[in-house]
Amino acid sequence: MATGATKLTAPGPAEPFRVFLLSPADCSGKRAELLQRPDPGHPLGRKLHGGGGAALGEVFSFVSSLYFRGKLAYARAFALPPRGQGGIHVITPSDGLRPPESLLRLHDLRRYAGVPVDAEEERYRRPLLRDLRALAPAWAEAEVVLLGSIASRKYVELLTAVLGDRVLFPSDFVGRGDMSRGGLMLRSVEERRELPYVPLLGAVRRGQRPARLPPKGGEPREVT
């Protein structure tokens, strides 16, 4: 179960507690395969093969590149968890929720690669529901923000089954692809500007692709 980094400062009167759930990286893709090679050239791969492991957030940031890096940076900037609780929880393919600081080893990465992230997959579903139910009481006064895919069932169905209308997502995610979302979150961190959130239940989760992010210091560019 995730614990994550703990913030001890309480929010102001108008600011709610907020925790983030980050969707996992694709552990069966080419970048994940690079880390699993017998003689990995990347320092991160050597950590995994060395037995000591590497931080989950670091591994997923390498595997997913811009998208997960954006999610993790954004969550670190804006998490405001209840006292004694972690503010960032990573959804994993078969270990439920884990903090980004937890150690991932080579056999974990290989195991993740073999488990589909699908609402009907019991190896994914059961651990996630277990951890959501265990943490739900601690989140009674908190907003729970999903940073991940909102268009499919794989996260939406399970999160809302336990947490109901407490689950939110950034409304600016609608219509954007992974790379665009990653860039949007990194831009938000740089500008110290939190995105607006809406409840996941009943929301419009599909839409037209929005305009591209404007260049820094320039005018918005429309999608062509």
Spans of model-derived segments:
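Peripheral peptide segments
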Residues: 2-224
